[in-house]
Amino acid sequence: MIEFKALNTLDQLLTYRAKVQPNRRAYTMLNINGAEDSYITYGDMYSQVLNIAQRLLSEGLQSRNAILLYPPGIEFIVAFFGCLYAGVLPAPIHIPKSNRSNKKISDIVSATEASAILLLGKDEQAFRDTLSKEENWPKDLIYVPTDMTVEPANSQNLPLPEINGSAIAFLQFTSGSTSLPKGVMISHANCLNNLEMIVAMSQANSDSTFVSWLPHYHDLGLVAHLLCSLYSGGHCVLLAPSTFASQPIQWLRAITKYRAGYTGAPNFAYQLCVDKIQPSDQQTLDLSSLRMAINAAEPINPQT
């Protein structure tokens, strides 16, 4: 097995974790009430990722681009890594909520020349119906519901491509609030160097727990939480952004319950906690386990 210091791609990182600590919880998803909705270990995640990679290879998607349209949850991170193992370039973006959002997604599909959309089976028909109405929507786009089992046409596993560190791992898109969404290419090497720096600074390790409600298509959510947790071999507890927006205290309750050492958010999130959490509720919280709470992605207000 390759040594940790010799890892040069994100897929190698997951393989390492699955071999070294297969029974360690990798990710846990909480529902709106703060109860566990689902969880996955590194070993189970690796198995599911390989299945998705085979599905993508069987669809002929190697070396092609794919849009990832997922709600918050473990299904996203499994699909994301399925792309990496299959040599498919993933572009995670937000679920469309309006005609304006549909137009942005159409622009991203055009800009990336995407060949496929990865999504949940329950969302496929709705997305087909709404997105296909967009001008210049590609008629040959492949829809891949990654949570649905499909019998492979070939019983033999297709060989996984060899990925090198200089290859582009994924695309991150700007919000497109003031102009067309712009894609940023993130290489495996660039991402791993960033993760190494963050983990070294935070001193996170395989005993660490992260808590995040941040969108998985944003850098702070994807890299600083989902991938940093994987890099350190820790456990990442997830909440939906909508859960935090309606009940900010659930973020702090998760930190309290799981004795999390690491979390982060933009300044507005901390201010929302200050404004919305009542003194009586504060008595139920214990944030003494925190080693690092990142405040980033927007201007910091010292008064917060």
Provide a role label for each language-model segment.
Residues L14-I40, I168-L171, T178:
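AMP-dependent adenylate-forming
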Residues Y27-R64, L68-I77, F81, S98-S106, ...:
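Conserved AMP-binding/adenylate-forming core of the ANL superfamily
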Residues P22-R25, A153-F173, S179-L180, N190, ...:
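Conserved pre-ATP/AMP-binding loop-to-beta segment of ANL
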Residues I2-T9, K103, V144-I168:
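Flexible, low-complexity linker/hinge segments
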Residues G73-P96, D107, T112-A116, S208-T209, ...:
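A short helix-loop-beta submotif of the ANL/AMP-binding
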Residues L131-P145, P241-T304:
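Conserved adenylate-forming
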Residues Y85-A153, N267, L272:
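Structural core segment of the AMP-binding/adenylate-forming
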Residues L192-T209, D219-G261, K276-S280:
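Conserved AMP-binding/adenylation subdomain of ANL enzymes
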